[in-house]
């Protein structure tokens, strides 16, 4: 639907490749993408037991993110969240209520699509945070600190994590791009 949140560098890249010729409407990739979107809309519009609006699930998911995967995280909280999210996501797909039609502009449908995406993104955030057994920047783990200071593990976590979609939001594949430090070496920081 044209809604993107991207790092600045990705936008620059897309700006450079926009000169590629557009795909024809009957191209296999276009047909496949259209069919996938239509199937998703149909699934969203036809929840078996529609009750609450997308905002209800958005609030519940947001509360879990805020309390269990905020700036300060713990293994226990992350594991608990990873048990809660699939249950809430299943409830969302069974019960989300979308008024109106899937054939015209429908802001409730747009919101539901975003919330469905947030479930996948949120779960990935928790998986990544649980796997990163250190405290560094936005990855502060309560069990990895020393005298109140973040305890980094540069030996095991000096990499860029690129998570790959496998078709199951609970089982992404981690691809690591090692970081090399030629000019400036990592050093211990003090926030005191």
Where are these regions (language model features)?
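Glycine- and aromatic-enriched mobile tails/lids
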Residues: 1-192
């Amino acid at each position: 639907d044209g809604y993107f949140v991207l790092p600045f560098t990705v936008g620059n890249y897309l700006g450079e490749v926009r000169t590629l010729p557009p795909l024809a409407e009957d191209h296999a990739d276009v047909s496949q993408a259209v069919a996938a979107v239509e199937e998703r809309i149909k699934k969203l519009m036809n929840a078996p037991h529609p009750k609450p609006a997308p905002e209800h699930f958005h609030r519940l998911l947001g509360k879990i993110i805020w309390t269990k995967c905020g700036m300060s995280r713990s293994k226990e909280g992350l594991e608990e969240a990873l048990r809660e999210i699939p249950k809430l996501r299943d409830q969302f797909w069974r019960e989300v209520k979308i008024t109106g039609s899937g054939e015209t502009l429908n802001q409730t449908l747009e919101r539901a699509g975003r919330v469905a995406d947030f479930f996948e993104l949120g779960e990935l955030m928790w998986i990544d945070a649980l796997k990163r057994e250190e405290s560094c920047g936005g990855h502060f783990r309560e069990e990895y600190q020393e005298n109140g200071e973040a305890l980094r593990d540069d030996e095991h976590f000096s990499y860029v994590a690129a998570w790959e979609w496998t078709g199951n939001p609970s089982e992404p594949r981690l691809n690591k791009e090692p970081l090399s430090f030629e000019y400036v070496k990592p050093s211990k920081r003090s926030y005191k």
